[in-house]
Amino acid sequence: MQLNITGHNVEITPAMRDFVTAKFSKLEQFFDRINQVYIVLKVEKVTQIADANLHVNGGEIHASAEGQDMYAAIDGLIDKLARQLTKHKDKLKQH
């Protein structure tokens, strides 16, 4: 899995990059055929936003989450992606 992390109006610190890498590596337990991940971390006034696009075998998955701080937004994003990956995996098993 290749991670591409970018920031808009926020500096990506090494600690934040390590946190994102650790969280996204846990997604492989839900679906092991994740090819590329594009992550955009944004700050808009008081809201922290985390967006992700996953290129997986059989399609693409997109999710977005907001939080009071960036780490909470990333945690929410991981929860959404885990649900979507489980649903995608079940859909592929049915065919």
Curated annotation (Swiss-Prot):
GO terms for biological process: negative regulation of translational elongation. Keywords: Translation regulation. Pfam families: Ribosomal_S30AE (PF02482). Gene3D superfamilies: Ribosome hibernation promotion factor-like (3.30.160.100). GO terms for cellular component: cytosolic small ribosomal subunit. One of its GO terms (molecular function) is ribosomal small subunit binding. It comes from the Bacteria. NCBIfam families: PRK10470.1, yfiA. During stationary phase, promotes and stabilizes dimerization of 70S ribosomes by the ribosome modulation factor (RMF), leading to the formation of inactive 100S ribosomes. Associates exclusively with 100S ribosomes, which are dimers of 70S ribosomes. Belongs to the HPF/YfiA ribosome-associated protein family. Short HPF subfamily. This is Ribosome hibernation promoting factor.
